Amino acid sequence: MRNESPSGSDLSPGRDLCLNFYLLVSICLLVSVCLLVSGCASTVPGRKYMARYERALGLYQEKKYEETLKELKPLLIHFPVWAEGSLLYARAARATETIEGRRQASKILVRLMSNYPDRADIRHELASLYFEQRFFTYARNQYETLLRANEKDSESHYMLGLILQRDWKRYGSKKDLSRMITEFASTVETDTLNREAFSRLAAAYLEKERPDSMLLVLNRFLRSYPSDLDAVMLGAIAYHEQGKYEQSSKEWDRFFSLCDAATQGVFNDISLLITPQRRKKFKRLDKAAKEQFVRTFWKGLDPTPTTELNERILEHWRRVGISKVLFTVDASGTPGWRTGPGEALIRYGFPKNREFSFTLEETAALSLPTLIWHYSDEEGPFEVAFVDYALSGEFQYFEFTRLPTAFDRKTYYSPTSYEHNYGAQVFHNLFANAGFLRDSGVREELYVGIPLENVTKGDWGKVPFEAVIFDSLWNELSRVSTTLDGARTYAEPDVGGILIRELSFGLAPGRYVVALAVKDTVSGTLGLTKANVTVRALSRDRLSVSDIELAYLMPEKRVETKIGKDKGILPNPSGTYVVPKPLRLYYEVYNLARGRDGRYRFVTKYSILPIKSAGGTFWGFVASLFSGQHYIVNSFERQVESPSSAERLSIDISALRDGSYNLILEVEDSVSKQRVTAERAFEKVSVPSASGGASTRGHP
């Protein structure tokens, strides 16, 4: 029989405890060794993994980002906190430009920052990733942290400036604009080769309305990059802001000599400034006709047509340039002139007021980023709205209805808006013209009236006077550079003093444009006139009558003189008469037929009819024709000794009501029975009342 122990076990209790103790110690030692080896490896990769890192770095430089990630994957698993390997992996993942890649990069960079909070390169990478993902608040915090550690970090200054620029465009805070200037200025101080920073700093000074500072920055930059297109363009804009148009024009010439044909086409495109009807017509023209169309278009808008410089086209180039600088969308590459705000700027210039709204809070109504620009002109106020539909920073027109908005009406009926800064007090000259038949052809006389209150009394021979005649296509035909020497003065208590200067040109029948300029160098005032003139054909073979010349003064007695000589008439270029002064006029009759008695006879009939006002009704106009105080009709017969006659006429217009009228002359040859007519508009006003009421007189 076998003996059994009491415990029922083959091993003693002491030996069992000893085995368990040794097993526990072995496990602890093994874990410690593994942790030690793992820790050393995560800090210092071995030769095998370093070779893998070198291969990955080469692939990254070759822009093979997916292969780079595959090569780095084992390193990321075995050495998760090794900075260089993880940083390269994050950069490669980000470079794939996928959502998953950016997510992985963000996760790795945040982990690295927790282990290496003082590594500026890691923080830079994280900040730029936040900026790329449009997490601007996070990016701003990272760049501000970098600048606290290193004030000369030019990259952080520049990126922070970009964030502030975005905020300025959205919210219009002057504080953001000032700080944006500070950040870009700090960038160019530490990095003189950052072309984008120079360009953005100059643009910021432009928005700050500091062209002097803008030029200082650009001149410094152009010393290093004399052919930089944006810098040359901004220089032209800066000179324009200072009112130095000639210098601005030189810079624009330099700009166009450097840029390509496509850029020149963008800056010279007039499609935004003409109506859709004219745009369709323009597209059907050939190349030569298009060039003529554009030249005529710009010349017609020239605020100073007597000079070689066309400030209106300079303003157009300025607006296109500003739209490029301020509204180009960096993310999509959309040029500024193709955005809503850019187009509005090119059409109308800068608005008087700007509004911005943007709400994404749960407690408020959803609102996409919206810009509203408020304008006001002679037609009244109007506004243009833009919306950032994709939250991309690209604003486009807000089209909420198919009904014509104020913007649509402005586009179709008044597509251009510009008010030139002449750098002087500007007044408009009074102007009239009349054509007379002479031996050499039609002689067109021009009568210019300068209000004496606008020029300094003194030697009129020292006041420059410029007159230029253009044909209908704005080709210069004649130019006279003279003074006001020889001008005559007319003054009455109710009219005020007017200085009258006469010029004459020999012109063929047709349509012309007359440009006149008077510059008082003492007071600095500038008198301008741009008027369309039609020269009538006056026949030498049959009865004809000259244009009607309105006059302030004429000789009381009729003097028989040769046609057009020593008329003794003081022209009235204003076309306005103040009762009780009569309407005075001068005209000439040509080619009368001789009667059997050797004399020449003709009948003159004149009619004065009211001109229908723009705001009047048709039936009101018809009723005025039957009002005894609204029209005058009379006739008389004249007998003269020659086939041509110089006629002077005074008409009492005291019975007429105040308003605008048309004088119609009808001359009938009593022998040949031929008839001819001539017309002239004038305005009749009343004498101011004794109580001091203002006169209603004006100049049509």
Model-based region annotation:
Residues 40-91, 95, 99, 103:
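N-terminal leader/linker segments that initiate helical-solenoid repeat arrays
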Residues 62-70, 95-111, 133-145, 168-186, ...:
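Structural signature of tandem alpha-helical TPR/SEL1-like repeats
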Residues 88-91, 125, 159, 200, ...:
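Canonical tetratricopeptide repeat
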Residues 48-50, 83-84, 120-121, 154-155, ...:
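Helix-start (N-cap) detector for alpha-helical repeat units in TPR-like alpha-solenoids
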Residues 134, 166-167, 206-211, 222-459, ...:
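Residues within mature, well-folded domains
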Residues 399-700:
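Intrinsically disordered, low-complexity terminal regions enriched in Ser/Thr/Pro/Gly
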